From Swiss-Prot:
GO terms for cellular component: nucleus. The keyword Nucleus applies. Residues 1-18, 129-149 have a biased composition (Polar residues). Regulator of type 1 phosphatases which maintains protein phosphatase activity under strict control. The keyword Protein transport does not apply. The gene is ypi1. InterPro entries: PPI_Ypi1. It comes from Aspergillus fumigatus (strain CBS 144.89 / FGSC A1163 / CEA10) (Neosartorya fumigata). It is found in: Nucleus. Keywords: Nucleus. This is Type 1 phosphatases regulator ypi1. Residues 150-162 have a biased composition (Basic residues).
């Protein structure tokens, strides 16, 4: 009766098998070396992968057409590494409210948009432009508000400076003094 035992070796690609006989001494001690490569294959690769990762079978990520290929490496991600603003035609507004559908059936123009004054009354931009042309004392008497309020709203009728993008904007931190200059 003989036993077979596998002896670990230093190389990963070969194994040693040594035959040992029982208490009966034999003159020929032979060592058989078997070398080869063992390749294991799963029956269905996707099922084996899902079980290893702990996910349910049949559950896969499916990317939609609008998912960005970050950095052009063929790796899709739902997180975008850059903030991209699509260029707009010259006459088109850049505000996000123009992109969404409005709930009212009437189109809004700049002159029809309501502004609330300090007393809570709604006024149109057209009225604010008229207020800006009046003297400060007349505006205060006519509307019951300070002249600085009207001046501030009159500036809205003109072109405004473009706001910085998300990378240029510094977050406001409460309780810490603002640093000036870089």
């Amino acid at each position: 009766m003989s036993r077979t035992r596998q002896v670990p070796s230093n190389t990963a690609s070969s194994s040693h098998i040594q035959l040992l006989s029982p208490a009966v001494p034999q003159e020929n001690h032979s060592t058989v070396r078997i070398s080869g490569t063992l390749r294991l294959r799963a029956e269905n690769d996707s099922i084996a992968t899902d079980h290893i990762e702990g996910a349910r079978p049949g559950r896969h990520i499916r990317w939609t057409e609008d998912v960005v290929d970050n950095e052009g490496l063929g790796k899709k991600s739902s997180k975008v590494c850059c903030i991209y603003h699509k260029p707009r035609p010259v006459g088109e507004s850049s505000s996000e409210s123009d992109d969404s559908t409005s709930s009212s059936s009437e189109p809004e123009s700049d002159n029809d948009v309501d502004c609330r004054d300090s007393t809570g009354r709604a006024e149109s931009h057209e009225q604010n432009a008229q207020d800006a042309s009046q003297s400060p004392s007349n505006r205060s008497l006519n509307r019951g508000r300070t002249p600085s309020y009207t001046k501030r709203h009159a500036k809205r009728n003109g072109k405004r400076k473009p706001s910085p993008n998300a990378y240029e904007k510094m977050p406001k931190v409460k309780g810490q003094p603002r640093k000036t200059g870089m």
